[in-house]
Amino acid sequence: MSSSAIQVAKTATFLPDLVEVQRASFKWFLDKGLIEELESFSPITDYTGKLELHFIGSEYRLKRPRHDVEEAKRRDATFASQMYVTCRLVNKETGEIKEQEVFIGELPLMTERGTFIINGAERVIVNQIVRSPGVYFKDEMDKNGRRTYNASVIPNRGAWLKFETDKNDLLHVRVDKTRKINAHVLMRAMGLSDNDVLDKLRHPEFYKKSIDAANDEGISSEDQALLELYKKLRPGEPPSVSGGQQLLQTRFFDAKRYDLGRVGRYKINKKLRLTIPDTVRTLTHEDVLSTLDYLINLELDVGGASLDDIDHLGNRRVRSVGELLQNQVRVGLNRLERIIKERMTVGETDSLTPAQLVNPKPLVAAIKEFFGSSQLSQFMDQTNPLAELTHKRRISALGPGGLTRERAGFAVRDIHPSHYGRLCPIETPEGPNAGLINSLATHARVNEYGFIETPFWKVENGVVIKSGDPIYLSADREDEVRVAPGDVATEDNGEIKADLIPVRYRQDFEKVPPEQVDYVALSPVQVISVATSLIPFLEHDDANRALMGSNMQRQAVPLLRPERALVGTGLETQVARDSGMVPISRVNGTVVYVDANAIVVLDEDGQEHTHFLQKYQRSNQDTCLNQRPIVHQGDPVIVGQVLADGSACEGGEIALGQNVLIAYMPWEGYNYEDALLVSERLVTDDLYTSVHIEKYEIEARQTKLGPEEITREIPNVAEESLGNLDEMGIIRVGAFVESGDILVGKVTPKGESDQPPEEKLLRAIFGEKARDVRDNSLRVPGTERGRVVDVRIYTREQGDELPPGANMVVRVYVAQRRKIQVGDKMAGRHGNKGIISRILPREDMPYLPDGTPVDIVLNPLGVPSRMNVGQVFELLMGWAASNLDCRVKIIPFDEMHGAEKSQQTVTTFLTEAAKLSGKDWVYNPENPGKLVLRDGRTGLPFDQPVAVGYSHFLKLVHLVDDKIHARSTGPYSLVTQQPLGGKAQQGGQRLGEMEVWALEAYGAAYTLQELLTVKSDDMQGRNEALNAIVKGKPIPRPGTPESFKVLMRELQSLGLDIAVYTEEGKEVDLMQDVNPRRSTPSRPTYESLGVADYDED
């Protein structure tokens, strides 16, 4: 198939750098954020005021990291750099100054791809969206149905201040949700006189009631107000004027305790039309008075006062890596400050040096805690390049300082008009996180204040001006202007064609003539996220299915031989490039050397640049990361050119699946309810074969009885089982292993108690110690098999850091090729997913007029009710493209080129395909898009013509191999004694209450009894049953289930006198073993069967 691609829709398809969100934020942290924090803590003085310690933040240094990225991954280390900062210790009494560079901790560094390497694993810090600090005005209904208004001043950190009105037109204030205080009490406590307040208000008469109320309470002076304030905020403590003053000062006017942040100051200035400089981060009298004034205007409904919508993106901001890290550094420095103050007090003043005062531990711990266990620091989703890219662009409302799943209502999760071009309205998880985790839209960027902006072209007098850079607007700014969507039709000179244009203005839709349009969106794609923008004909899909399509593309497994989609949207190249999976040339030059491991480019100055390629490495999700060169020796290359394909890439484009021939028709019920019928060709030609790499690890520990040993000498193991082990007892690379094979031989010393009596006897007689060790080798688990691709040995001698108590760690990587099989999940890009129900020989599949058998048969009933018609357009466009031997790029939302454009385009392509290929059956105008198929089994044509074409189908990561599981006996839960659940725990299948009802309805009493007792949690019964089976005896009667005893104990613990009685009224002691003849064996005893055992029957 030739690789010519036809671009159908011409619009702005260039995208900004898609990982910029992460990189820019971390750069800000290194340039400004860290310095800000260090300087805000400087100087630290001791309690007597004799010593001062200054951090000179602007002079901090980062050392070169100890390991590079690859080395850090290999050694399970953190890719981090040591931070040093210059400290100056000033002795106020003697005037002595000591300056010294001090180590303050390790800072993990971001890799070029926007990720962090923590303990050898790649992690991503997800962006968090939180309520912006500032002032918010809301209305509430009281219980009498009267509307009251309130104003909240929310800082970045510190106490909340809330003003509210009541039914008597009095103004109250609450500090941090405590009891209500008359607002004028706060004004007086702040030292404002009645006139100071009244002069600042536009409607002072409303406020006078609050002054009268304060006077009635006998609070007429500043001192009385301070006492009253102290009483309300600290009830139960003896009030004092100085205490009140200090309380007020520290709560709102101390920069250490109260911080609006740059954003908060900006928002307050904007809302209240103030001009306070943004260096003033605490509350001012002006802020408080303006807030009161605005609230009174709201109450009286004058002065253009408006309420705030907290779900508007102008009131929510994004905290990216840099800021989250800065907050964490602040926590660490707070702890450090306490330690420094204590050391200053305790130590000898004269001999103290900065290095003795500064202990790096608190800061190291705070940063480690953030990267290791914060909700926002996540194990990177590396299933394929798209999953990786989407993870870095994710925006979560959860996490510290954010919402919780249970508390989040419908309004927060819902799509808001201000999301346009900022957050994707489609891509979000299904389930409890829906709407709380979003994805950044394709063209969106985060500005310096943390608000999301999106680009527009300016429109002047009905002409779109596309020269120069587009203009980025935040959600606030956008509300004030009239914005037309990105798919308005324009002439070549940029003039808008239509007479009336639908525009968005103040979150509403109206139609205006072109002259009144202020801006037009950059591209139709800017509304949606990266994953969604890869879906062709998206506009024909229902949003719920497009959501599934977006999410399932992220779960596509990289295949052995990826293939680009026949029908794409034009964004595939950039997704592959920005994901960081494909190596890109850094210079203009010529390729001088290429092999599977490295590509060398010679630049114009004669310097060599070597690009090392990843070969068969394991990803976080056990998929395979592999890069294949696509340039040849002697090729000229330019800056930014793709040199090699990564996993799930082909020709520098993202290629998540395969283009396969699909027919929509029922086939013998095998595609009922979303099942798929597939051809054997997908298996034999390795179309959907993928490589998975599993990691197995074992450590040799130091035990009380001596060290464990990694060795070839394993007791009671036949020599043939050791065939693939080397002299150390470790499997050789390249060996093929199956379930139960030994990967690493290990023996553990056995204690005295572990020995059976006969061995103790031999020991007593011969006095010689047989080598008492037991086999503790690492074996291949149940359903796995594959080829060993790598073995890594870590020891202390080599300088590796090992877990405490371990002498040696061995890791074995096993790769397996998985062909597609029944039970695997597949999906298209439109949310059309299914499970393979049968693999049919290709001679039995329905075939085309030229004898080509189809690859997959889908159920046509999956389309109408789900309303994802995009799949049908893709099918037919793919059919035309394959017959024209080309690939097609169609940007979504193509009606800017005319009404019903998709249908026209597809029809044009199909007629063209029929003409050029010389096969008139390719397109039949009588049955457009349908062909007459014949049944592969009989050769007879089917009754009706069938829709056939090429579609891009993915194999998803939910593979049946990882799910299939069986158990005979296995571990039991400690309390209930029932089998555990899940494959990882070797668990059983849950027999829930509905299954019990089914068996009850059937009357299967004995089956039910043994399911609830012997096969579950009747401890004695199950051991006796197993013994009976082994000895061939009849199975004894079941006893009491353990969970019944637990229930009895629980009821007794509530103080209920509850017991079980026989029919004769005798109490049964459940805790006593039913069969007193012998104690229950902990495991079945396989005694040799004597003659007596047979005679009894």
UniProtKB/Swiss-Prot annotation:
Key words, A-Z: DNA-directed RNA polymerase, Nucleotidyltransferase, Transcription, Transferase
Enzyme Commission number, as recorded: 2.7.7.6
Reactions this protein catalyses: RNA(n) + a ribonucleoside 5'-triphosphate = RNA(n+1) + diphosphate
Region annotation (Disordered) ranges: 1072-1097
BP terms from Gene Ontology: DNA-templated transcription
MF GO annotations: DNA binding; DNA-directed RNA polymerase activity; ribonucleoside binding
Enzyme class name: transferase
Transmembrane intervals: none
Secreted recorded as keyword: no
Classification via Gene3D superfamilies: 2.40.50.100, 2.40.50.150, 3.90.1100.10, DNA-directed RNA polymerase, beta subunit, external 1 domain (2.30.150.10), DNA-directed RNA polymerase, subunit 2, domain 6 (2.40.270.10), RNA polymerase alpha subunit dimerisation domain (3.90.1800.10), RNA polymerase Rpb2, domain 2 (3.90.1110.10)
Keyword Translocase on entry: no
General function of this protein: DNA-dependent RNA polymerase catalyzes the transcription of DNA into RNA using the four ribonucleoside triphosphates as substrates.
Family assignment from sequence similarity: Belongs to the RNA polymerase beta chain family.
Descriptive protein name: DNA-directed RNA polymerase subunit beta
